[in-house]
Amino acid sequence: MINMKFFNRVEEIKEILSILEEEPNLIYFIYGPINSGKTALINEIINNRLDKNKYVVFYIDLREIFISKYDEFEAKLRATKTFGFRLIIEVLFEEYEDDKKPIEIIRSLIKDAPSLCGIPTPKNTLEEILKKKTTKNVFKYITNILMDIKREGKQPIIIIDELQKIGDMKINGFLIYELFNYFVSLTKHKHLCHVFCLSSDSLFIERVYNEAMLKERVDYILVDDFDKETALKFIDFLSEEILNKKLSDEDKELIYSYVGGKPILIINVIGKLKHKNLKDVLNILLMDEISKLKDFLSNLDYIKPKVNIEEEIIEIRKEDIINALKLFKGKYEIEVDKIPKAVYVYLVKKNILFLYPQRGTLKPQSFLVWNAIKRVL
């Protein structure tokens, strides 16, 4: 694992810190392509940019919560409404054996940690909440804790990473809408708590963007792959950190032409240069991506892809998928209306394309995917 200082994201950090200085008013969705650095950005802010004397952060990473329980919850949610309620408990609360008041637990925990991984709740209190089996009691309990934090002179912040993992569960009238309604209450109505939701699922962001109940109640912060200028600076930064030298302009341009501004791919390339040749590293990455794309297209000869659009199941032809991908041979980003919705939904779900709902455009998930498209089609 390469350990290094955080790089750039000056504008995004400035924007988020500016939001935190004002009273809570909107739900903020921090979104962008896979591995563009969303979680790294929010961790940098939590760990190094916030005054612990002013803020109490609840950082809930659904990747950790659902890694072993997602399938189990999915099945139980389909079977009974009760487990929808239990899922919210599972997501938002952190159980403690201690019988101290939650605010006392919070005081002791934030001395040693920059953030908390859930709403700290004594075991006996949690058992009482579970007996009542209503989200109303859950949200009332959380609100009371947040108000206690405000009375202590601190500003609470709730951050949920990979929120779409709940959004995928289209059960009981969309469980996630109960959370949205509550977050609107915390921000727009009570001005009590800042709420940030992180997601790399652009279809989920599109659903949020088009949701009438959230109009004028949410805003968006895009954490995209680096542009070329920033990517080249990042390559300089990494090569000095990892290789103790600068790369030539020719080598930097070559790296960018293969992987673009995807931070994780640039890190991967520079890390391997300690013991491998640059062209070999880049060619292996590209060949791997080409192989994945060919395999994806080959599978379409044996399966009939389907997507759900407004409760209608739409079947997609291989020919339509190929025609859509060919549009990117000469262009990295295109207007969304150039591709039938069912086709782009399928390609986004497969992490081949990324959707920008606010721009109304699509692009490959990375330069590497783009290069594979140009060579295969």
Swiss-Prot record:
UniProt-annotated binding residues for ATP: G32, P33, I34, N35, S36, G37, K38, T39
Keyword check for ATP-binding: yes
GO molecular function list: ATP binding; ATP hydrolysis activity
Pfam families, A to Z: ATPase_2 (PF01637), MJ1010-like_2nd (PF21690)
Domain of life: Archaea
Keyword terms of this UniProt record: ATP-binding, Nucleotide-binding
InterPro entries linked: AAA+_ATPase (IPR003593), Archaeal_ATPase_domain (IPR051667), ATPase_dom (IPR011579), MJ1010-like_2nd (IPR049081), P-loop_NTPase (IPR027417), WH-like_DNA-bd_sf (IPR036388)
Family assignment from sequence similarity: Belongs to the archaeal ATPase family.
Protein name: Uncharacterized ATP-binding protein MJ1010
